């Protein structure tokens, strides 16, 4: 990428931007705020899809359980925000982490 291409890539877009959110919403509260902020900023952001991400800590039994809990939490937040229309654009992410930078993990 040359200097002009980099400057163009870093220029703020005009109007609404399309966005996809990949979130472990059940893990920590920051993701819940991100979902609410994005959906309440519809003059700036066009949320295309939301994906539940895996996580593993004391709140889950493993990455797959963390992803499923995040998926359910996303749907709960969408209901609270009265944005049930986004539930059909919400997907389960992968049940495992990437093994390396070359091997994809299946998801919805």
Regions found by a protein language model. Give the residues of each.
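N-terminal acidic, glycine/proline-rich low-complexity segments
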Residues: 1-108
């Amino acid at each position: 990428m040359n200097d002009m291409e980099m400057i163009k890539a870093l220029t703020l877009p005009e109007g609404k931007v399309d966005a996809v959110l990949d979130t472990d919403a059940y893990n920590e509260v920051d993701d819940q705020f991100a979902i609410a902020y994005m959906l309440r900023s519809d003059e700036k952001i066009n949320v295309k899809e939301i994906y539940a991400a895996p996580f593993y800590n004391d709140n889950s039994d493993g990455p797959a359980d963390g992803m499923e809990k995040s998926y359910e939490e996303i749907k709960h937040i969408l209901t609270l925000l009265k944005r049930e229309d986004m539930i059909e654009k919400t997907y389960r992410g992968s049940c495992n982490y990437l093994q390396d930078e070359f091997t994809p993990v299946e998801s919805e």
